[in-house]
Amino acid sequence: MAAILGDTIMVAKGLVKLTQAAVETHLQHLGIGGELIMAARALQSTAVEQIGMFLGKVQGQDKHEEYFAENFGGPEGEFHFSVPHAAGASTDFSSASAPDQSAPPSLGHAHSEGPAPAYVASGPFREAGFPGQASSPLGRANGRLFANPRDSFSAMGFQRRFFHQDQSPVGGLTAEDIEKARQAKARPENKQHKQTLSEHARERKVPVTRIGRLANFGGLAVGLGFGALAEVAKKSLRSEDPSGKKAVLGSSPFLSEANAERIVRTLCKVRGAALKLGQMLSIQDDAFINPHLAKIFERVRQSADFMPLKQMMKTLNNDLGPNWRDKLEYFEERPFAAASIGQVHLARMKGGREVAMKIQYPGVAQSINSDVNNLMAVLNMSNMLPEGLFPEHLIDVLRRELALECDYQREAACARKFRDLLKGHPFFYVPEIVDELCSPHVLTTELVSGFPLDQAEGLSQEIRNEICYNILVLCLRELFEFHFMQTDPNWSNFFYDPQQHKVALLDFGATREYDRSFTDLYIQIIRAAADRDRETVRAKSIEMKFLTGYEVKVMEDAHLDAILILGEAFASDEPFDFGTQSTTEKIHNLIPVMLRHRLVPPPEETYSLHRKMGGSFLICSKLKARFPCKAMFEEAYSNYCKRQAQQ
């Protein structure tokens, strides 16, 4: 009973103080002050006293206030606002004159619309404070909410509680200043970021056996068939809408909402190579595949189911041994990310170092061939993909690449090499590998902070330009200087940290080397494209075996146009506007012609290379970057020629 009355006292007094603060704020905003403000304060003081007397009498006490004797461990119970004082986030509504020590202190309140921010620990494992703090509506407050511990509401037998209030004055703080502070707080670069699992992700066991995985694809095929029949029936009964647009998702009855849900649900359940292929398609623009199918694969990219605890622990015990947890102080059993091949868990080493543990789904490495075959059969059956988009030789390349991505020991070695190559880089960094917690199916690295680039569209134009500029420079260095490239341009493989103003590079499973015999010719093709030299592009393309020289005119023109479009960005000293140039869309419009008339498959190296280059250009396009590119290529070309001369 005592605890309930104590909480009631605090709430009642707090409401009175909030009312006073609101009244004073509106009076000051309207330019009214003086006697009205003093009267409001007197009224508030009287109300607080009467509430204290009334509730004290209910308890059978004559004293207005006593101490709470509760001890929450001293200063650990302090509240903090997430906005600095200087930004005007904490407002003191006490009078300008010397405070009356007998009157209750005023309540500091964040000047913002709606409730104050909820508690957020400064790190994933930092204590949030005493019990109940995380649900407090007060948010964080720097300084004491009450200037004197004796001013806290209390009654005999209650526990002592400490609150804190910022006593800094707000003299001269205008509504404009407060609005600027509010806008500064809202900017993406000023927020703390922590990666979390998609709200669509569910805990579902990964089907391990090939028969179990085949059953899921078989169920998907049957479901798509029935869904398509239902959609055809709907179309026959439904006319076009008044605007003249089609009443269904697209021309294919297989692309209904119900079928989209079936595809997403199946791929997120089986994961592995099938989900990886869907994620690869998700980073293409709408000119490459049906825009409705692109939306399906975008949902696939953003959400994957995660393993049940028992299945995940079995993988860890098999790979790291039964005592792997002895090396950790903490292990978060629910993952904070789930992808196509594995899921990522937060952990803390004995020394306090926070790490990310990527755990591979069981059975995905052994089922690559069957998964790819099953998914392609389903997609081809439903006519969802452009004809000839995945010829047999490309499928073979994808199988080999996916097998390499399942080798976490190889990925760890690639990450170490990239970390050495970019050591001391002012903008990029590669998280360190934690060798003692790595195995063929477990990869552990230091934890990085930030957010993926698909969430960077709200950043300033200057920051977006800098991010994209550095990504393109890195692409050129990877190919022409390192001869070693991370070829997966997935948004989530680039994490921007606004506090450090750096980009962390993640996921090196798709890394591959490029021989100098390949890059010697390829850089000459880009050189000719930047110079708009169509004949040299043709000659070098034949030398590289892109063309045989016997292609029909329409095929040759499509190939040359695609190369020249790629070189447009490097052709001019003027800023190149990626947001309006539609480089990837122009190239993708030529793909159907090349698929139909190509006589020989392109060099195997170009599949991953063009995926990386096209994905990097697409990042620049999505972020609407605008900067000159000619100088970066000229520098890369000059340095390459110097290294050639020295060999």
UniProtKB/Swiss-Prot annotation:
Documented effect of changing R611 to A/Q = Does not affect selectivity for binding ADP or ATP
Effect on the protein of changing G225L: Slightly impaired homodimerization
Range annotated as the organelle transit peptide? 1-162
What are the start and end residues of every segment in region (Disordered)? Answer: 90-117, 182-203
Keywords associated with the record: ATP-binding, Disease variant, Kinase, Membrane, Mitochondrion, Neurodegeneration, Nucleotide-binding, Primary mitochondrial disease, Transferase, Transit peptide, Transmembrane, Transmembrane helix, Ubiquinone biosynthesis
Q: Which InterPro entries match?
A: ABC1_dom, ADCK3_dom, Atypical_kinase_ADCK, Kinase-like_dom_sf
Activity modulation: Autoinhibited by the N-terminal domain, containing the KxGQ motif, that completely occludes the typical substrate binding pocket. Nucleotide-binding relieves inhibition. Specifically inhibited by 4-anilinoquinoline compound TPP-UNC-CA157.
Q: SUPFAM superfamilies under this entry?
A: Protein kinase-like (PK-like)
Query: What are the EC numbers?
Result: 2.7.-.-
Annotated phenotype, changing N493A: Impaired binding ADP or ATP
Chief location of this protein within or outside the cell: mitochondrion
Q: Where in this chain does the record put each Protein kinase domain?
A: 329-518
Where do we find the motif KxGQ motif here?
Answer: 276-279
Transmembrane residue ranges:
214-230
Family, per entry = Belongs to the protein kinase superfamily. ADCK protein kinase family.
Q: How is this protein named in the record?
A: Atypical kinase COQ8A, mitochondrial
Species of origin:
Homo sapiens (Human)
